[in-house]
Amino acid sequence: KRQVLLKDFDKNGFVFYTNLKSDKSKAIKNSSKISMCFHWKSLQRQIRVIGIASKVSKKEADEYYKSRAYGSRIGAWASQQSSILKKRDDLYKSIKEFKKKFPDQKKVPRPEYWSGWRIKPKEIEFWLDGQNRIHERLKYIKKTKSWKKVLLSP
């Protein structure tokens, strides 16, 4: 299970970006069938998406990367996501080194190991909290050209 920041969605799916050497990317490479969940405790609602993940195009990754703040682009170079740090100062030193390497804020290239994943949904389930645990659950299942709607028992 991994937490990600949803950055885009359209008719082709849901998109998030990450380090391709991260644990989540390794898990996706091992099995492209994945799920994601949006939970709104205060609204008593949840949406679960099950689908197939594929990498976004280099062009799409480049476009999004260029839209990020300078510090975030430097961070993509400086941080080896999920690796063990001996001390936090090592990370700050790496950030400083990459700021020297890429002083022009408009010319920070996207690292090859940084890209995005698109989740093409096959199923989407909507859960609405109900009194006495009699929840409402609606599931949409992707067919060739349409979605089939089914009502699930709580």
Regions found by a protein language model. Give the residues of each.
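Binding-site signature for planar aromatic cofactors or substrates
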Residues: K1-P154
